[in-house]
Amino acid sequence: MGDGALIVAVAIKGNNSKTKGVVRWALQEFASQEHVVFKLLHVQPRDSNSVSTTRKDLTTSVYKKDVDRKTREMLLPSRDMFVHREVQLDIMVLESDDIADAISKAVQDHGISELVIGASSSIIFSWKLKRSNLSSRIADATPRFCSVHVISKGKLLNVRKSDMDTETSIADDRSESRFSSDSHSGTVSSTSSHQFSSTPLLFQRIQALTTVNQKVGTNIGKQNNEPHHHHHNRAGSLDVDESKLLNQKGFYRTSSSGIGYGGSDISSWRSSQMEEASSSSTYSDPTSSSSQIHKDFELEKLKIELRHIKGMYAVAQSEVIDASKKMQDLNQRRSEEATRLKNLTIREEEADEVVEMERERQEDAENEAELVRECIERETEERLEAEARAEEVRKEKQRLEDALEGGPLQRQQYMKFEWEEIVEATSSFSDELKIGVGGYGSVYRCNLHHTTVAVKVLHSDKSSLTKQFHQELEILSKIRHPHLLLLLGACPERGSLVYEYMHNGSLEERLMKRRPNVDTPQPPPLRWFERFRIAWEIASALYFLHTNEPRPIVHRDLKPANILLDRNNVSKIGDVGLSKMVNLDPSHASTVFNETGPVGTFFYIDPEYQRTGVVTPESDIYAFGIILLQLVTARSAMGLAHSIEKALRDQTGKFTEILDKTAGDWPVKEAKEMVMIGLRCAEMRKRDRPDLGKEILPVLERLKEVASIARNMFADNLIDHHHNAPTHFYCPITKDVMENPCVASDGYTYEKRAIKEWLQKNHKSPMTDLPFPSDSLLPNHSLLSAIKEWRSQLIK
């Protein structure tokens, strides 16, 4: 910094519009000058001793850091304004309880030649009459070699020159200094001004007092309009004494602004005085006339100053009350903050103890984790080596198979069985092993490769050996769905298919209460919640077939006889292998009509398919609707839709009579909802049938949830009253049979919901009382399958 640099200090208090106005004025006034250095001053109070003694060193440091951070954030907008103008800036944050003294010392120590400050709220009354505001005290305390600029609303309000001239002028910088008054007061004409050339200072003082009186009167009027009734009473007592003096010269007080004039304002009075002076100059001594004018002026000046003092008194009284209230609030906040600080200190000590304990536990856990990590690394290396060796063996085996079979494209996706194996397993197709006869062939139960399977032997005709049979067999071998009958293998040369065996027969046998054969006992009826679940399973399998890519698969022969049930009454659709892959392009419709006759069972065939021969996914929707009606009623498909519609139209409660009573107590609302879906699916025109994915599946999904809840309640009742589950079926935490068993990292199996809640509150195993190595949970599928099978046996 050069010796000839101009040092300009800008003192700010906070971050508001007043501060921005002060900074903006300083930049506009001094930034264009050469060799100028700006200093941004901010004074913050010192921390009291009472507070510092109650804090610990750590808390005091945190408190100071927080104060410094808030100060930087407060000064940031002002700093950015200086940076934007690309001027040299130093930021000085002073700590002192006396703002004026701190700024004075900074001006003295740094040789500041220009000081820019903001005006206090009460400075509008008078710079000379009120010296108690902060701006005045700063100006008085500042050394005389420094000029002080007082800014209000972005404008220059007052300047204290550095040449020791203490005279100040109170004027609005937007108006020019001229000898004039407003439209209500009139003007002093130039023709009469020569008569008072002997007293120009007198009229200048009258003009200044008039301007000040108007501004102060307006401000006091605003103060009086506010609802401070307790101030008005005291001010009113002063007005009574003042009115006697004002009436002598024609002055009075108005209700709107607090100060007014009767008949004419001060300019009118001034004009009358000039006329009196002019007339008296002819008949009296000029010296005595001038003396009388000075006396009258001094009297009027005292009256105006009296009004100023009373106005400032009212404002000061209001400020004192506000300051007192703020002081009470600050004391209350200080007490609350002290209590809060004490509580925080106690909590901090407790937290330190907990942290120390956790640190010790962490060290122990890290040591244990290190041992586990080393074991895992060794096991991982061994596993990777084993996988690498297995991959090499697999590739070699694959290479040999490709060489033997002529390439990967010729490999079959299903197991090939020799015809002799099938003949031997079925005891030369013994009638004792026959479990069903269909339109395409007979079905036998037998054992192949130590597995119970169902072998369908197609009727021996030429169609079974065509290219279409092999194409459909290839497609079927690639389809996998939980509710589609699984194809295990085939003997393509003889048109034989090998499926997984379904122990509980077909849905038709369970609904119509028919035994598969004479030797088997009568199966129990399906309960209503199982029927809701079966309906959803069939719909999900159909949706899988209909959304197949690149072309949908239509079953064409969907009926209860082709829906099979396993040990747990889980349903699977059979005869998928003889389904039809259709092209939804309308140009192929005639081809389907000419080459394909109606296929399927009469009461389940789509009426439009019967009429046109066109195979579409909606054909399966029609058959599915009939099946839904049979699930609810357990009646024959013939005329079923018509009889149900008739029962629904009857208001005498016949709907409950068509429900299958052997299924238990039906929920009437849900049963009626399923019947309505079935009737919509069985509409005569396919365009009137609902969409499987958007309309049917969401409804059945909701019904399945209702059925799942009812099934669990039914099973729990059986468990509580009649049966005891195996001990490993119970959760160690809830002591109930698990519905979703999961293996935790301690090696024990828990109910998933219960162990998750345990892990949120505890880190030790409820069985071993040792820390969990990790929070991972693995589903125990084998145990879940065993629990489901056990529940199914209970329900049966």
Swiss-Prot record:
Keywords: ATP-binding, Coiled coil, Kinase, Nucleotide-binding, Serine/threonine-protein kinase, Transferase, Ubl conjugation pathway
Enzyme class per UniProt: transferase
Compositional bias per record (Low complexity), positions renumbered to this chain: 182-195, 270-291
All copies of domain Protein kinase, residue ranges: 429-700
Chain segments annotated as coiled-coil in the UniProt record: 298-407
Annotated region described as Disordered, given as residue ranges: 163-195, 218-240, 270-292
Keyword Kinase: yes
BP terms from Gene Ontology: protein ubiquitination
Superkingdom: Eukaryota
Residues annotated as binding ATP: 435-443, 456
Biased composition (Basic and acidic residues): 171-181
Record-level GO cellular component terms: chloroplast
Enzyme Commission number(s) from the entry: 2.3.2.27, 2.7.11.-
Active site, renumbered: 557
Catalytic reaction(s) noted: L-seryl-[protein] + ATP = O-phospho-L-seryl-[protein] + ADP + H(+); L-threonyl-[protein] + ATP = O-phospho-L-threonyl-[protein] + ADP + H(+); S-ubiquitinyl-[E2 ubiquitin-conjugating enzyme]-L-cysteine + [acceptor protein]-L-lysine = [E2 ubiquitin-conjugating enzyme]-L-cysteine + N(6)-ubiquitinyl-[acceptor protein]-L-lysine
Pathway annotation from the record: Protein modification; protein ubiquitination
SUPFAM superfamilies on file: Adenine nucleotide alpha hydrolases-like, Protein kinase-like (PK-like), RING/U-box
Family: Belongs to the protein kinase superfamily. Ser/Thr protein kinase family.
Function summary: Functions as an E3 ubiquitin ligase.
Stated name of the protein: U-box domain-containing protein 51
Species, as recorded: Arabidopsis thaliana
Name of the gene this protein is made from: PUB51
